[in-house]
C-alpha cells in the first residue's frame, strides 16, 4: 500500500516538536521533544490521495518513524524521521534518509496530561511541568 508513496509521494511536515508517552508506574507520562537550538523540526512523511468507501476524496499523510537516537531512546524506542534543513531536498528527491546518523540534538521535558484532551488547544500544551526527576 505504501510502496508507491515511499517512492513517489514524499512530504515534509514542519513542526516545533512532537510528543512521546513514557510508561511509568504512575501511568503514561507525556514528553515534548524539540530541537535544542529551537529551530523547526523537519519531519519526513509520505502522502496519499484516495477515495473512501463512501466515495469521499481523502488527502492523508503519515509520518515515518525510525529507531530513536540517544536523546529520545530513554522515553521511546521510535521517533519521527527528523531531517536537517539541508537534507529536505534529498529526501523529497527519493534518497533513503533512514540510514543517516541521527545526530540532531533533541531536548525534552514533561508536559501536562492535558495534552491528551481533544478539547484543549494552545501553545501552553508544550510548557514544562515540575517533576521529581
Give the predicted meaning of each segment.
Residues 1-133:
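A structured binding-face within diverse protein domains that lines the active/interaction site
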Amino acid at each position: 500500500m505504501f510502496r508507491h508513496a515511499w517512492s513517489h509521494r514524499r512530504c515534509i511536515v514542519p513542526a516545533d516538536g512532537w510528543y512521546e508517552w513514557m510508561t511509568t508506574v504512575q501511568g503514561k507520562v507525556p514528553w515534548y521533544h524539540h530541537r535544542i537550538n529551537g529551530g523547526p523540526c523537519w519531519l519526513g512523511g509520505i502522502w496519499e490521495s484516495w477515495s473512501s468507501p463512501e466515495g469521499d476524496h481523502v488527502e492523508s499523510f503519515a509520518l515515518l518513524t525510525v529507531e530513536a537516537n540517544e536523546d529520545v531512546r530513554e522515553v521511546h524506542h521510535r521517533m519521527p524521521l527528523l531531517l536537517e534543513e539541508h537534507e529536505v531536498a534529498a529526501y523529497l528527491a527519493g534518497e533513503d534518509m533512514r540510514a543517516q546518523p541521527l545526530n540532531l540534538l533533541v531536548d525534552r521535558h514533561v508536559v501536562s496530561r492535558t495534552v491528551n484532551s481533544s478539547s484543549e488547544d494552545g501553545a501552553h500544551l508544550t510548557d514544562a511541568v515540575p517533576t521529581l526527576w
